[in-house]
A protein has these predicted regions:
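A short, proline-enriched helix->beta-strand linker immediately N-terminal to the Walker B motif
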Residues: 154-158
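Conserved ABC ATPase "signature" region
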Residues: 102, 106, 113-131
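Conserved ABC ATPase signature
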Residues: 135-142
Length: 210
């Protein structure tokens, strides 16, 4: 049975590519429902760390658990329990808003009935109902950002990983995006967000440790 004390646990997690060390013995833990900010400059290894934690890249050394599962041995179980949003938002520009939602719902193994029910609610929450037939490529960047995050948690994962999610958007869109993150955390989803913006750490909440 997986441990439930921490959503994410890393101990001296390291990744080397030949003589180059991309991630050097990082150690941290993340509690359930926490919004955890992972700060670092561009090229500091944040994306590499996420790839190890999501089971896409095997660590060179060290240990990590995600949702109670070993990142070396239980990658498929990890993938079933997480959501992921990349820097480029992971959306298909040539598909419509509702087609993107439906596609990811099916990828996550949801039934058509559940997808349709959740989609209707999501479109209303995002005020996207009138835009549901529009191609994603035609949407403003801030709208794409909100949609990409909503798609990443559409299957209601235990943890969602966000890799530089606020890059390239204006301060107003960034603030609105963080409101979505707060709502997800309030529903019990653990949020792991990488950023190189120091001010973004002001949005992260240490409340689960208080």
């Amino acid at each position: 049975m997986p441990s439930t004390e921490y959503s994410i646990l890393a101990n001296k997690l390291t990744k080397r590519f030949g003589d180059f060390t991309a991630v050097d013995e990082i150690t941290f833990d993340v509690l359930p429902g926490e919004i955890f900010g992972f700060l670092g400059a561009n090229g500091a290894g944040k994306s590499t760390a996420i790839r190890m934690l999501t089971g896409l890249l095997k660590p060179t050394s060290g240990y990590a658990e995600v949702a109670g599962y070993d990142v070396r041995k239980e990658t498929e179980l990890i993938k079933r329990n997480i959501g992921y949003m990349s820097q480029k938002f992971s959306l298909y520009d040539y598909l419509s808003v509702e087609e993107n939602i439906f596609l990811y719902g099916r990828i996550y193994g949801l039934s058509r009935r559940i997808i349709q029910s959740r989609m209707e609610r999501l479109l209303e929450e995002l005020n996207f109902y009138d835009q549901r037939k529009l191609r994603v490529g035609s949407l403003p960047l801030g709208w794409k950002q909100k949609l990409a995050f909503s798609v990443a948690i559409f299957h209601r994962p235990k943890i969602v990983f966000l890799d530089e999610p606020t890059g390239g958007v204006d301060p107003v869109a960034r603030r609105r995006f963080w409101e979505l993150i707060y709502n997800a955390a309030a529903e019990g989803i653990t949020v792991f967000v990488t950023t190189h913006y120091m001010d973004c750490l002001l949005y992260t909440s240490p409340s689960p440790r208080d």
